[in-house]
Amino acid sequence: MPKIFEYLGVLIFFYSNEHEPIHVHGKYNGLESKAEFYIVDGEIVEIKIKLVKGRRPLTGSNLKDFEVFLEKYADKIVEKWVDYFNYHKNIEFEKINTRIV
């Protein structure tokens, strides 16, 4: 389970056996949601938050923090996903404790 970011306590990661579409999971205190990235002609055109089967979803401020982070770091998240799954590179974990405004 490569952890790629932590933002204000929300852990952002993917499972090592993942598949397309490109997506990441956000987890906080046992709650978990996932975000799928829809890409057309190399551009991210949409990010959809989805439920994770068997898990209670992120709620309230944690869900909002996850959404804000995804919007700001979408390109970097996709880059890390591609590096890990397509190029089998090690990826760096980054912890961010400053709120995005």
What are these regions (language model features)?
Residues R55-V101:
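Acidic, low-complexity intrinsically disordered segments
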Residues E20-G60:
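A short, structured beta-strand/loop element
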Residues G9, Y15, E20-I22, E43-V45, ...:
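Residues in flexible loops and secondary-structure boundaries
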Residues M1-E32:
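Short, charged/polar N-terminal "headpieces" of proteins
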Residues V10-I12, S16, K34-E36, A74-D83:
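Broad hydrophobic/π-residue packing in well-ordered secondary structure
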